[in-house]
């Protein structure tokens, strides 16, 4: 790419007129795919280590929903002619059940914040992708509420200290 092409692309992006508007949407989908796959794996791990049997089923359900999100995103990527990105493995932790739930809640909040920013970036460019990501955002809110409920049931006092 020559200097003139780089300069004109810079101006297009600076003014919000990207040469390839779907490229941003694809980048968002790739990032969300990796994140949903990692979260599905993480929630499965939390469920397997959970000392509270009543929470085990709920964590497995969240993991399955995360896996379904990843499948939906994968379908969009394939439909756009893209290869699925490699998903780095999660590292295992030896934290207690309560700390795992708290970390899961923090992760859901961080992910939700990222998703809001990503949606702003592609809102008008790709309504089909925006709709999928908004659906995922709604389910993330439900997950946060469920995790918060589990935390309060496991140790209500500890949640007020965090």
Predicted regions and their residues:
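Iron-associated oxidoreductase/ferritin-like identity signal
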Residues: 1-162
């Amino acid at each position: 790419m020559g200097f003139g092409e780089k300069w004109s692309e810079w101006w297009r992006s600076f003014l919000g007129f990207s040469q390839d508007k779907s490229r941003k949407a694809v980048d968002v989908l790739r990032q969300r795919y990796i994140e949903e796959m990692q979260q599905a794996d993480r929630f499965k791990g939390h469920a397997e280590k959970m000392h509270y049997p009543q929470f085990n089923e709920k964590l497995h359900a969240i993991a399955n929903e995360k896996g379904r999100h990843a499948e939906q995103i994968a379908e969009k990527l394939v439909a756009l002619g893209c290869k699925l990105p490699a998903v780095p493995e999660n590292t295992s932790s030896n934290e207690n059940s309560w700390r795992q739930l708290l970390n899961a809640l923090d992760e859901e909040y961080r992910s939700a914040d990222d998703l809001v920013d990503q949606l702003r970036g592609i809102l008008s460019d790709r309504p089909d992708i925006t709709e999928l990501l908004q659906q995922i955002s709604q389910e993330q809110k439900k997950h946060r509420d469920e995790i918060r409920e589990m935390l309060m049931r496991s140790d209500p006092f500890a949640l007020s200290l965090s």
